[in-house]
Structure formats: C-alpha cells, structure tokens
C-alpha cells in the first residue's frame, strides 16, 4: 500500500513539472474556434490554480493526521508534505505566466521553486529506495502476525470448547447430585449424557454379589424383546474395560457392545465406547482414606448413532471420562449415606432396646427395692424384736439349763437374722457373695449352743442324740461365728431330713489331725486347704446317723418315732443348691463340707472342716457351762439417769429398744416420727443428752432429722446415734458426715447398746 502511494506521488510530480513548461515556440495552434489559444491558456491557468489549492490542502490533512496518530516514518511524510507544498507553489506561480511578458522577479521565483521541487522530489525518491526493504519486512511480519492470529483463534476456539464442555459437565454433575439414590443417579446420568452427546443408547452394567457376572441394571432405551441380560465377568471386552482407566472403544461384534446397543442385532449402531466406574462403599473408608481392597467396578456403555458416520472425538471421550468419575463419586456418597441410614436405624433399634432394657431394669430394681422393704418390714423387724428380747433375757439371772436354751435361741435367731440380711441386702454386683464377719468368739459356747439345738431337733423327730467333743479344743478363736453356726445347723437339718427316725444322731467335734484315715484321704484329695500358717487350727464338725443298739421301750420314745417327718428326697435341685452355697461359704472360711455316703448311696454322715486363727484361751470343759466372757462389761453407772429421746416408727421395736435403754438405767422418751422428735427437743424443760434415730422413718428420715437438730441445737449436744438395719459400709460414713456421733446396727442387743452409748459419751467428754 505504501509503495503504491509512493509511485503515485512520483508520477504526479513528473506531470507537474511537464505542465510547468511555457515554451510554446513549436506549438502550431489554430486561433479560430472554441479551442483557441486563449481558451486553452485560461483552462491551464484555472487548472494550475485548482492544483495549487489541492496541493495546499493535502499537507494540511497530512499534518492533522500526523498530530493525532502515532505512525512510523514520520520524516517520510514530512518530505512528502514539503514536496507537495513546493509543487503547489510552482503551479501557483506558473498560473501568472500565461499573459504578456513576464517580470524578472516572477521568473526568478518560479525557477527557485522548481529547483527546490526538484531537490525535494529527488530526496523523496532516494528515501523511498531505502524504505522499500523495510516495507517488505513489514509484509513478512504481517504474514507472521496473521499466522499468530490464526493460532490464537484456534486456541480461543479450544478454550471455548473446553468452557462449553465444562459447562455441560457442570450441568450434568449438578443434575447427578440432585439425588442421593443410586438408581436415580444412574438414570439421570444416562438421560443427560444422551442429550449432551446425542447418543443412540446408553447402559450401565453392575457386578453381582459373587462378582461372577455383569448384569444390565440401567438402560436408556430398553429392548422390549429381552427383559434380562447377563454377561460373564470373564468376557474379554469386560476384562479389558475393567483393567483400563480410560475410555475403551469396543468392537462392532463385541457382546458388550451388541447387548448395550438396544437394537438386539436387528438395527445398525455406531461406535461404542465403554468406561469403568468404581463402586466404593462406606465400609471401604477409614478416616477418609480408601482401604486397599478389591474394588468392584461397574461399566457404563455409550452408543453413538450410525447416521452421519460419527466417531468418538477427544472432546466426547473426555466428557465421558469426567462424567464417569463424577458418577463414581456420587454413587460412593450415596452408598455412604445409605449405610449411615442403615446404621442409624440399627442404632435406633438398639437404643430403643436399651431404653426398654433400662426401663425393665429400673422396674426390676424398683420391684426388688419394694420387695426388700416388704421383707424388711415383715421379716427383719420381728426378728430384731426377738433378738432384743433375748438379749434382755440373757442379762437376767437364770439357771444353767435356762441359760443354755436362751443362748441357743439367741444364736439361732442371730443366724436367721444374718440369712435374712443376706437375702435382702445382697447386690447383683457382689455376684451372690456374702462378706465374712471375722472376729474373736468362744468356740466352746458355739458348740454348746449347737448341741442344744441339735438335741432338741433330734428328740422332736424321734432320734436319739449323742455328743462327742474333744476336750483339748481351744476356746477363743478368730473366725465368722454366725457362718460357722449356720453351716453346723445346715448339717443337722440335712441329715435329719434325709433319713427316718428311730436312729441315733452323733454330733462330733474334733481338732483336725486326729481323725481317721478316711479324713486323711479327704485332705489328700484337696477338700480343704492345708497350707495355712502355724497359728491356725483346723476344726472338724461331723453329724452321723447310727443304728440304736438298745432301743428304749417306753411309750414316749415310740411316740416320737411316729411323728411325721418332712422329707425332701424329691427336691434334689434345692438340696444341691443349698449344699453348693454352703460349700462356697466353707471355702471362703478356708475349709470344706462334704457328704459321706454308706451302702446303696444312702447318706449317713456329713463332715465340715473349718480353719480358725488361734489365740491364748482358757481350756475348760464345754459341758461344765462356766466359760468366761470375752471381756468384762464396763460399769453402767455413766448411763443411769441419762435422758434419751428415741425415734422409731415401728411400735414393737420402739417398745423393745425403750425397754433395753430403761434396763440400762436411762430415762427414755419414745416418739414415732421425726417431727415428734424435733418437738420433744424443742421443750426447754427436758434437757436431752442423747437422741437415738431410726434412719428408715417415713415422711422425714433420720438423716434429715439429724441435719435439723445440728442446725438448731448445735454441733456438740445432744449426741445423735443412728439405728439402721442396713449392712452397707457407706451408711456409717454418711452418718458421720451428717454430724452423728455413732451408729447401732439392728438387731439392737443390750451389750451393743450399752457399749455404743458409753463410747459416744466418753468421746464427747474428751
């Protein structure tokens, strides 16, 4: 373009120079007619003026263009402007040379401007010669820029296609993730992908549970001729697709392609592509990281239509791969949600079962507590009353036989009270075990009382009774007196109930180590523990049934033999259970209990071996009945005249406890509730030194009464002593925390009551 402009300007300058020549000597012009010399000169003059005007306007336009644009080679344009201006001046001066003689000045200026025009035109021509190579280089660069523009257009087109693909994939992904149901996700994928890629058909194949077959579970256009399609998982195309991460183009005769086309072999179909989709489940994840497990794969098959000879493009393949990844993620999320819902349902069922179990346990616990309260009220309290009365009888003056009978009754009642406490206070967390109450006691007294009870039972049931007690038995031993007496009573009852009357019962007590060879064989078989320390002693209790050698002929004895006996031969389960419980008790006391059968399996004797810790003792005959007490009782002078308030809601127990306190010389005011106790303490005229409270009173229990007493009466006086039937250890600690000074555990015995009162008074006076 610039070269054409330069050539045009050069030709224009040459014509201007030619037109400025005024030498008309050789002109042979005709002066007649319209085209006369004068007319021609006028036309040339007008033309020169118009050319001058045009030459003067063109530089102005170029100057305006240069001032408002940034074009290269401005100095070339400046040369053109000078050349055009000089040409214009030449034409302007030449217009005055057509009439008459010319002045010297006009010819001089015309010559000067022509000379300048010649110089400028030559300079411009030379400049164009140097500029043409640069212009040619510009042309090459223009071609290069055109090539770059074409490449940029291709890249822009690719970016537009990628953007379009991303938009389509995003729309498809949004449609897929609208649902969290696996079947809806797959159905939506097939429909939307078919719209985007203009597919003839699409299908999804799922593996079965055993991973031996691929089942056609979802299809865009199902073939009505076949309702179910199965392909073996070891099919070559299936294996190839499952082992490849990218899209696989299937063969025309592929079973997977034919079965997924929806044509059934009757119609043509286009190229078929297949890609695998991992089917991850929630169990494959731990902390968000998949385990290295054999992941099952589904296969998505996409079929193009046969028209227009379409093939799979890179864009379509990329869309299929991206969609397959998105479907795998969506299905894994749906699987996790489904499994979480199932887990939530299972947890809900378990929670409801736990709530029902908790309610049942609370109801059972409530029923157990209610039963314990009823049993405590119906069994404990009467037994506590009996024990309290017997303790009063023990302090009275009696004959030796009466004292033995009262002591036997006291011991039996104590054992029965312990059994009742075991039944009522036993806790499931204790596994049915009862704690031992180990203390020092008189073994002679225990044997004497057991023999008294055994003789009474034997005579009542028509048996004779004999007693064989070793004289060198120690008196003071350490062990559980109640449990020992309980086991001995069980042996007597068991032997008497398992045989008929008319025989003799022998109650034998010996020191271990002096028995027969049969006893030694028992020890050798490990029936009791023999590896104890030297300061322990083994005592063997035995109850044996023997035939009467010379039966008495008096009527009383004969009458006793016909007394009906209670027998339990048909209740072997209860007998075994009782024997097992007694064996556990004996083993807890480092001993054992067993039965020695005679001929034909008939029970004839029962042995019990127990271990006791020995202490220095006074060895006296048991039958003499004058064994000393463990300790001499302290004087009750400190208790005489002591003002005591007794609060117990049970009338019988309150009366017995009041009688025990009065026997100790105390002045007792008995009330039946906590409110009456507080009213009695508010009486200024009566200054009570001791308050005895039953902890299980209704309306206001003993703890609440004690708290109110300490709040209004002070922290030191009156002394507060609790009465409770509970055997739990934490009760005493709670009593001390509530400001009480002592605790007496029911049954209330006379010597226990006196000892606790003396201890509390002595502690308070210190």
From Swiss-Prot:
<feature type="modified residue" description="Phosphohistidine; by autocatalysis">
    <location>
        <position position="377"/>
    </location>
</feature>
<dbReference type="InterPro" id="IPR036890">
    <property type="entry name" value="HATPase_C_sf"/>
</dbReference>
<dbReference type="Pfam" id="PF00072">
    <property type="entry name" value="Response_reg"/>
</dbReference>
<comment type="function">
    <text>Ethylene receptor related to bacterial two-component regulators. Acts as a redundant negative regulator of ethylene signaling.</text>
</comment>
<protein>
    <recommendedName>
        <fullName>Protein EIN4</fullName>
        <ecNumber>2.7.11.-</ecNumber>
    </recommendedName>
</protein>
<dbReference type="InterPro" id="IPR036097">
    <property type="entry name" value="HisK_dim/P_sf"/>
</dbReference>
<keyword id="KW-0472">Membrane</keyword>
<dbReference type="InterPro" id="IPR003661">
    <property type="entry name" value="HisK_dim/P_dom"/>
</dbReference>
<feature type="transmembrane region" description="Helical">
    <location>
        <begin position="75"/>
        <end position="95"/>
    </location>
</feature>
<dbReference type="Pfam" id="PF00512">
    <property type="entry name" value="HisKA"/>
</dbReference>
<feature type="binding site">
    <location>
        <position position="87"/>
    </location>
    <ligand>
        <name>Cu cation</name>
    </ligand>
</feature>
<keyword id="KW-0808">Transferase</keyword>
<dbReference type="GO" id="GO:0005524">
    <property type="term" value="F:ATP binding"/>
</dbReference>
<keyword id="KW-0902">Two-component regulatory system</keyword>
<dbReference type="GO" id="GO:0010105">
    <property type="term" value="P:negative regulation of ethylene-activated signaling pathway"/>
</dbReference>
<keyword id="KW-0479">Metal-binding</keyword>
<keyword id="KW-0597">Phosphoprotein</keyword>
<feature type="modified residue" description="4-aspartylphosphate">
    <location>
        <position position="694"/>
    </location>
</feature>
<dbReference type="GO" id="GO:0046872">
    <property type="term" value="F:metal ion binding"/>
</dbReference>
<dbReference type="InterPro" id="IPR014525">
    <property type="entry name" value="ETR"/>
</dbReference>
<keyword id="KW-0186">Copper</keyword>
<feature type="domain" description="Response regulatory">
    <location>
        <begin position="643"/>
        <end position="761"/>
    </location>
</feature>
<feature type="transmembrane region" description="Helical">
    <location>
        <begin position="5"/>
        <end position="25"/>
    </location>
</feature>
<comment type="similarity">
    <text>Belongs to the ethylene receptor family.</text>
</comment>
<dbReference type="GO" id="GO:0051740">
    <property type="term" value="F:ethylene binding"/>
</dbReference>
<dbReference type="InterPro" id="IPR029016">
    <property type="entry name" value="GAF-like_dom_sf"/>
</dbReference>
<keyword id="KW-0675">Receptor</keyword>
<dbReference type="Pfam" id="PF25487">
    <property type="entry name" value="ETR1_N"/>
</dbReference>
<feature type="transmembrane region" description="Helical">
    <location>
        <begin position="115"/>
        <end position="135"/>
    </location>
</feature>
<feature type="domain" description="Histidine kinase">
    <location>
        <begin position="374"/>
        <end position="612"/>
    </location>
</feature>
<keyword id="KW-1133">Transmembrane helix</keyword>
<feature type="domain" description="GAF">
    <location>
        <begin position="181"/>
        <end position="331"/>
    </location>
</feature>
<dbReference type="InterPro" id="IPR011006">
    <property type="entry name" value="CheY-like_superfamily"/>
</dbReference>
<feature type="binding site">
    <location>
        <position position="91"/>
    </location>
    <ligand>
        <name>Cu cation</name>
    </ligand>
</feature>
<keyword id="KW-0723">Serine/threonine-protein kinase</keyword>
<dbReference type="GO" id="GO:0038199">
    <property type="term" value="F:ethylene receptor activity"/>
</dbReference>
<dbReference type="GO" id="GO:0000155">
    <property type="term" value="F:phosphorelay sensor kinase activity"/>
</dbReference>
<keyword id="KW-0936">Ethylene signaling pathway</keyword>
<keyword id="KW-1015">Disulfide bond</keyword>
<feature type="cross-link" description="Glycyl lysine isopeptide (Lys-Gly) (interchain with G-Cter in ubiquitin)">
    <location>
        <position position="746"/>
    </location>
</feature>
<keyword id="KW-0067">ATP-binding</keyword>
<keyword id="KW-0832">Ubl conjugation</keyword>
């Amino acid at each position: 373009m610039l070269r054409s402009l330069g050539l045009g300007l050069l030709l224009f300058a040459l014509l201007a120079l030619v037109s400025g020549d005024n030498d008309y000597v050789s002109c042979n012009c005709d002066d007649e007619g319209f085209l006369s010399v004068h007319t021609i000169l006028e036309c040339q003059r007008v033309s020169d003026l118009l050319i001058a005007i045009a030459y003067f306007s063109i530089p102005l336009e170029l100057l305006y263009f240069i001032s408002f644009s940034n074009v290269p080679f401005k100095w070339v344009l400046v040369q053109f402007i000078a050349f055009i201006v000089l040409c214009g001046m030449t034409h302007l001066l030449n217009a005055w040379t057509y009439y008459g003689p010319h002045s010297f000045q006009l010819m001089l200026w015309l010559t000067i401007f022509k000379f300048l025009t010649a110089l400028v035109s030559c300079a411009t021509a030379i400049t164009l010669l140097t500029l043409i190579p640069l212009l040619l280089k510009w042309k090459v660069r223009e071609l290069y820029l055109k090539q770059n523009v074409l490449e940029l257009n291709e890249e822009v087109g690719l970016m537009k296609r990628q953007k379009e693909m991303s938009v389509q994939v995003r729309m498809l992904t949004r449609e897929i993730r609208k649902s969290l149901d696996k079947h809806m996700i797959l159905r939506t994928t097939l429909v939307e992908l078919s719209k985007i890629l203009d597919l003839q058909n699409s299908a999804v194949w799922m593996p079965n549970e055993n991973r031996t077959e691929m089942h056609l579970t979802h299809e865009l256009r199902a073939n009505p001729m076949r309702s179910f399609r199965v392909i073996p998982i070891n099919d070559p195309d299936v294996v190839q697709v499952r082992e490849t991460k990218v899209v696989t183009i299937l063969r025309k005769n592929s079973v997977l392609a034919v079965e997924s086309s929806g044509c059934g072999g009757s119609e043509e179909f286009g190229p078929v592509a297949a890609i695998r989709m991992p089917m991850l489940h929630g169990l494959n994840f731990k902390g968000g990281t998949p385990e290295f497990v054999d992941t099952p794969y589904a296969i998505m098959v996409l079929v193009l239509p046969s028209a227009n000879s379409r093939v799979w493009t890179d864009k379509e393949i990329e869309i299929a791969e991206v969609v397959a990844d998105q479907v795998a993620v969506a299905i894994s999320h749906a699987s996790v949600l489904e499994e979480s819902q199932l887990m939530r349902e299972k947890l809900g069922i378990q929670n409801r079962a736990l709530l029902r179990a908790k309610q049942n346990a609370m109801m059972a616990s409530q029923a157990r507590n209610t039963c314990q309260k009823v049993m405590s009220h119906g069994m404990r309290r009467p037994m506590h009353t009996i024990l309290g009365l017997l303790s009063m009888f023990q302090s009275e003056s009696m004959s030796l036989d009466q004292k033995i009978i009262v002591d036997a009754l006291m011991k039996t009642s104590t054992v029965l009270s312990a059994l009742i406490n075991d039944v009522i206070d036993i806790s499931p967390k204790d596994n049915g075990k009862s704690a031992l109450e180990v203390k020092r006691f008189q073994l002679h007294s225990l044997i004497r009382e057991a023999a008294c009870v055994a003789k009474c039972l034997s005579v009542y049931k028509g048996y004779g009774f004999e007693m064989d007690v070793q004289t060198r038995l120690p008196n003071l031993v350490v062990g559980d007196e109640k449990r020992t007496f309980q086991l001995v009573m069980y042996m007597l009852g068991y032997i008497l109930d398992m045989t008929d009357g008319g025989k003799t019962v022998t109650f034998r007590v010996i020191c271990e180590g002096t028995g027969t060879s049969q006893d030694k064989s028992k020890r050798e078989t490990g029936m009791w523990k023999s590896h104890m320390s030297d300061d322990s002693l083994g005592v063997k209790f035995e109850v044996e049934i023997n035939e009467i050698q010379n039966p008495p002929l008096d009527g009383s004895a004969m009458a006793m033999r016909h007394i009906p006996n209670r027998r339990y031969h048909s209740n072997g389960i209860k007998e075994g259970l009782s024997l097992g419980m007694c064996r556990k008790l004996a083993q807890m006391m480092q001993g054992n209990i067993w039965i020695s059968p005679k001929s034909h399996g008939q029970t004839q004797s029962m042995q019990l071996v127990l271990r006791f810790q020995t202490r220095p003792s006074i060895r006296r005959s048991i039958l003499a009945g004058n064994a000393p007490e463990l300790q001499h009782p302290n004087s009750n002078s400190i208790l005489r005249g002591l003002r005591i308030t007794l609060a117990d809601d049970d009338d019988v127990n309150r009366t017995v406890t009041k009688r025990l306190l009065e026997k100790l010389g105390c002045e007792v005011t008995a009330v039946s509730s906590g409110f009456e106790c507080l009213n009695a303490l508010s009486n200024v005229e009566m200054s009570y030194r001791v308050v005895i409270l039953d902890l299980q009173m209704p309306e206001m229990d003993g703890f609440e009464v004690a708290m109110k007493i300490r709040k209004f009466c002070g922290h030191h006086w009156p002394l507060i002593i609790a009465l409770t039937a509970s055997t739990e250890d934490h009760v005493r600690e709670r009593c001390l925390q509530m400001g009480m000074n002592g605790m007496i555990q029911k049954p209330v015995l006379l010597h226990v009551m006196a000892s606790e009162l003396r201890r509390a008074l002595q502690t308070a006076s210190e």
